[in-house]
UniProtKB/Swiss-Prot annotation:
Record organism: Gallus gallus
A GO BP entry: melanin biosynthetic process
Keywords for the protein's UniProt record, in alphabetical order: Acetylation, Cytoplasm, Lyase, Melanin biosynthesis
Cystine connections: none
Primary gene name: DDT
Lineage: Eukaryota, Metazoa, Chordata, Craniata, Vertebrata
Cell location: Cytoplasm
Protein name: D-dopachrome decarboxylase
Length: 118
């Protein structure tokens, strides 16, 4: 069950239409998870500074069980997420940062229990 949070200082009107759904589909493909299990949040117009500059930028937080737990996995994921974000947001790769967080099944609650028991 991946969780993806995109934060950017770009105003909402500069984001492409349907970005949350596109990011959901891209995440499913990149991480090899069904889109029905992907959770996406997009926050625009955030006050942000990246590398000492308030120029347009974005950060992506990717949390998931079993697919973001190694440098080798995340190197491949990073390249594919960067391709998606630079295309969709019109930002250079130097204005984007990605953080990966591996999760354990007991850390995600769903249907009145945790994923460990589902």
């Amino acid at each position: 069950m991946p969780f993806v949070e995109l934060e950017t200082n770009l105003p909402a009107e500069r984001l492409p239409p349907g970005l949350p759904l596109k990011l959901c589909e891209a995440t499913a493909t990149i991480l090899g998870k069904p889109a029905e299990r992907v959770n996406v949040t997009v926050r625009s117009g955030m006050p942000m500074v990246l590398a000492g500059s308030a120029e347009p930028c974005a950060q992506l937080l990717v949390s998931s069980i079993g697919v973001v737990g190694s440098a080798q996995q995340n190197q491949g994921h990073s390249a594919r997420f960067f391709d998606f974000l630079t295309t969709e947001l019109g930002l250079g790769p130097e204005r984007i940062v990605i953080r990966f967080y591996p999760l354990e099944p007991w850390q995600i609650g769903k249907n009145r229990t945790v994923m460990t028991f589902l």
